[in-house]
Regions:
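Conserved glycine-rich cofactor-binding loop
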Residues: 12, 19-21
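Substrate-binding pocket helix/loop in short-chain dehydrogenase/reductase
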Residues: 98-99, 103-111, 211
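Active-site helix of classical SDR
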Residues: 122, 163, 171
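Residue(s) in the substrate-gating loop at a strand-loop-helix junction
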Residues: 147
Length: 255
């Protein structure tokens, strides 16, 4: 048996939300595995820092500071690329509110960012992938960043749960439509990860204690845990995996 090694040389990966946290870790991990990167975030200063790290691995890196909910801007960026082999659809947010107190503008913004822009990015990147004549031979990978909250309920997260559950349905539908082109589509579903986005929540000692008690492995995920799963799904090591989810949740959803 020949064990497939993770080697992403001659592959180009686009990562959104790449300026910080999970997206940053994923971009760096993909570069370490040999991929060239296209990184997108809202803040150029953050992108410059990530780009500098990526180039240490001798990978090419192009960065774009933009809002992924701006369809015209995203379309122009993707259409101007020579090729895309891997998409890490990572940009997203959470605005915790009790269901009865969810503000209309917050709900609409989360749906726009977490679900609609994810759909547009996936569609645009897939069309770019299909421009490569030997796509069926070399394959492609779309990784939608979901959440364990797409699989379980949680307080003050009804809108977040809804948007991430939508990604699970999108992923399965895409996987079926794109299988004939050897483009695989999966989600990665992390538990609470220590990132700038979750840092404020974890300052609450009661919340931190109660959350840890729900994770059988007894710790929060690190961004490297998520990046490892993403790199695996981006590579030929996962060539028979599509239309499913990798739960990086420390056992939370098994309880």
């Amino acid at each position: 048996m020949h064990l497939k090694k993770i080697n992403l040389k001659n592959r180009t990966a686009l990562v959104t939300g790449a300026g910080k946290g999970i997206g940053k870790a994923c971009a760096i991990a993909l570069a370490e595995a040999g991929a060239d990167l296209i990184i997108i975030s809202r803040t150029q200063k953050d992108l410059d820092k990530v780009s500098k790290i990526i180039k240490k691995f001798k990978s090419k890196c192009t960065s774009y500071a933009c809002d992924v909910t701006n369809y015209v801007q995203i379309k122009n960026i993707i259409n101007n690329q020579k090729k895309i082999d891997i998409l890490v659809n990572n940009a997203g947010t959470n605005i915790p509110e009790h269901f009865t107190k969810v503000k209309k503008q917050n709900m609409e913004y989360m749906v726009k960012l977490n679900t609609i822009s994810t759909f547009h990015l996936a569609q645009l990147c897939t069309l770019k992938m299909l421009e490569t004549k030997n796509r069926k031979k070399i394959g492609g990978s779309v990784i939608n960043m979901s959440s364990q909250m797409a699989h379980v309920g949680g307080p003050i997260r009804s809108v977040y749960n809804m948007t991430k559950a939508g990604l699970e349905g999108l992923t399965k539908g895409m996987a079926i439509d794109l299988a004939k082109n050897n483009i695989r589509v999966n989600t990665v579903c992390p538990t609470f990860v220590v990132t700038p986005m979750t840092k404020e929540f974890l300052k609450n000692k009661k919340f931190k204690r109660e959350t840890l008690n729900k994770i059988p492995l007894g710790r929060f995920a690190d961004v490297s845990d998520v990046a490892t799963a993403v790199t695996f799904l981006a590579s030929d090591s996962s060539s028979m995996i599509t239309g499913t989810s990798i739960l990086v949740d420390g056992g939370w959803t098994s309880i």
